[in-house]
Amino acid sequence: VSTFNVTGYSLGGFNAAYVAKLDETRQSFNFENVLLINPPVSIYNSISLLDRMINNIPGGMDNFDTFFNNLMRAYTNVYKESADAIGDDFLYKAYKALNLKDEQLAALIGVSFRLSSASLIFTSDVVVDFGFIKPKGLILNRYSNLTQYNEVANRIGFTDYYHEFFYPFYKETEPDATRNEFIAAISLKEIEDYLRSTEKITVMHNADDIILQPGEIEFFADVFGTRATIYPTGGHCGNMSYRDNVAHMVEVFTGGGTP
């Protein structure tokens, strides 16, 4: 192996930027090219957007179980009537068959994020024994009933986790850091000077990405300049497999940078 490149999408794109900066100091890989695909500007801002999408559930969070069960029942019916294996074609067919309104789609995205974040939050709580969901000091084993913890976790927003678990936990080792300083530290703006100055990092994004707050897409055009390729549509990573987009990604790594 003579050269190393790195890429990542979504949170992985965010991480790739920080890994590249860290490698400037450690010189472990000396990355030749780095491609960020649909990264957030601010992790906190993006998770706040995803958190709020769950508010689109008809009847609110009190109707979470009913909404989720009805959705899975409809999804199962489409699956039974389809000869397609679960994949892009099937998911598109399910989307068309369910005929979801924009609010329902937003709620679905919110539920998907909530289920993923619930697992992360509960696992983190168990590993460090913080006492956020599981009582502090309680030891779980393979036979422990986790139903009650799952019900609690599904009703905890990621921003709640940040303010009530993440920040207090790290506050013990960084006592002088404020909440806003912690939020600022998990943002690409924290390494903006580096991103402006290095020629090895390029970004591929979509103007309508749902994880970006209004105005955040301009950050990429401003900071990366000609190293930014911003498509008008595509949502969050929705056009990664398009032929032109794939060709762009390949060109970044084989053509020495921005096509």
Residues of each region from the PLM?
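Alpha/beta-hydrolase active-site loop
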Residues: 1
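Short beta-strand immediately N-terminal to the catalytic nucleophile in serine-hydrolase-like folds
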Residues: 6-8, 37
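Gly/Ala-rich beta-loop-alpha elbow adjacent to hydrolase catalytic centers
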Residues: 8-16
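Alpha/beta-hydrolase-fold enzymes
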Residues: 21-145
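Active-site nucleophile elbow and catalytic-triad environment of alpha/beta-hydrolase enzymes
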Residues: 172-193
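Short beta-strand/loop motif that positions the catalytic acidic residue
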Residues: 197, 202-205
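Conserved alpha/beta-hydrolase "acid-adjacent" motif
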Residues: 210-216
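Catalytic histidine-centered segment of alpha/beta-hydrolase-like enzymes
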Residues: 231-245
